[in-house]
């Protein structure tokens, strides 16, 4: 399936090789089980090997065959997708890989049902000394998720950038994740809510020594407006100072800034929220994408 998507071919080739290797290893491990009859070893073998997105596609040896294919044809209202952590090593390819998978699921059911993506929350060690974590892969993975929500029919996302644990890939507090998914569904699927999705940057423009970001609705700043960074003429990132006024956020901190970013780290500082009662967080942003 992914071989049909040129941007994902390299990813597909690597995953195909990995799948073949896993099949060989599985045969060896099964033989070992028969000899040892060790329950502890059996339990370890049953552990998920990483939950890469391709295992959910419709190829051989995939999770699709045992867990999704049996229910194809049954009524479906939508899907919730909370995956992607194991794909962080190829964040740009993720939009093509997951995008192709969503299309294949839609084709199997014969309908473009809602596909709600949980944009991944914060994870890994904080690096407060860095204005921008330029080599971080999770911000780019979150950006790919946003691209899918914008470009794949039926896809949409919830933003969870203010949640997460440094040392636990699964946030302990699950309630906000579920609530935000519900808000998105109520707005996009059931049409009973006006603002269920996170605020989005509509426009970013340099005005003198500042960058002005215009969001799609009024926002407010918490946490002293932290999380913004500006790229100076020397190509160095510096912390930005942010002020909100209605739907605009003005960021200053360096003369004639070249670019602006927000929440661009694996575990970023965050401050931008919708001004409504639900106070939904805005996701990561970069002006250079």
Predicted regions: what is each one?
Residues 1-289:
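Cell-envelope and extracellular/periplasmic
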